[in-house]
Amino acid sequence: MDRRVVITGMGGLCGLGTDTTSIWKWMREGRSAIGPLLNTELHGLKGIVGAEVKALPDHNIDRKQLVSMDRISVLAVIAAHEAMRQAGLSCNEGNALRFGATVGVGLGGWDATEKAYRTLLVDGGTRTEIFTGVKAMPSAAACQVSMSLGLRGPVFGVTSACSSANHAIASAVDQIKCGRADVMLAGGSDAPLVWIVLKAWEAMRALAPDTCRPFSAGRKGVVLGEGAGMAVLESYEHATARGATILAEVAGVGLSADAFHITAPAVHGPESAMRACLADAGLNAEDVDYLNAHGTGTKANDQNETTAIKRVFGDHAYSMSISSTKSTHAHCIGAASALEMIACVMAIQEGVVPPTANYREPDPDCDLDVTPNVPRERKVRVAMSNAFAMGGTNAVLAFKQV
């Protein structure tokens, strides 16, 4: 069954803001949310920057449900409710079996895991908090979204590190195309700003000491952030039948694996995923106006991605617009490509390419137009989003104007 899949609602929160309007406002302007961490439970960890959600917005999550939720689930549920409101949809007994959710989570509920560790091994406790297990499981965010909204169709978690959200969106597209659902909530959530995760990334020598500078000479690494992004996906027929406002079409999906190294990037994997995405969408390389790059700010990743883009797009690589919005919201792991989906869809909606913030000076190995520091007005009919994870799991999406 070849059904077109469209986006009719989006929700999100991250260091930039607690709804899609504020996220896009500051993303578009190139304002960075990266700064010193204010979390009081980092147990003496100093000198690490990140992008925090400093205060949660008001929400109507049931208190009985809230006690069983880790931060990743809370973020996902808040974003999911916003997406449903924008889409003008609600779930009821008549349609619940045709509504589902796929939520990408790169790390899981490490806040609950760390608290259990400290209770047992530091404080000398004998038992963990009762909901530790269900808070920490990678599928928790998807389950909590399902329960909060009453979704009874296909519901599952997706985990593939930094490409989790794009994989979740791709999986949701498949559910609709295969006829298993009419509506899917899809995206990602992660909350990595906890002591144990930050220490693990510090040990890999991957963290930047100051800020995230994708594609800029002198870039020093990744900055972690927390957040969530969710989209309402519908079959085109379902959306038009109810008179929905269509924000964009998910035109293509490209998936691949490097099969190379657990941390080091390879060119062939990202290249294959981008080529597969173009083929799935029926697009030529020249059709892409804007590419939201994976762009983590590490020397190896940004150079590798630049090479892959040149291989796929040829001369057009130098004329299309590219940017990495991780420079504004940081690397939110499982939520990263969900937030970048918001960037792509809004670029299509408003004809503005968000910039790569914090850019200082050109790197001759990253010589493409990465929209440094200043947004650019441009007609965007097709936008592509790259997500390339540690372990070499790659997921690329193409979004198209409808």
Curated annotation (Swiss-Prot):
Subcellular location field: Cell inner membrane
Listed GO MF terms: 3-oxoacyl-[acyl-carrier-protein] synthase activity
GO BP: fatty acid biosynthetic process
TM region(s), chain numbering: 329-348
Main location: membrane
EC number(s) per entry: 2.3.1.-
GO cellular component: plasma membrane
Family as reported in the entry's similarity comment: Belongs to the thiolase-like superfamily. Beta-ketoacyl-ACP synthases family.
Function as written in the Swiss-Prot or TrEMBL entry: Proposed to synthesize NOD factor fatty acyl chain. Involved in the synthesis of a highly unsaturated fatty acid moiety, which forms part of a lipo-oligosaccharide that is responsible for host specificity.
Protein name: Nodulation protein E
Organism whose genome encodes this protein: Rhizobium meliloti (strain 1021)
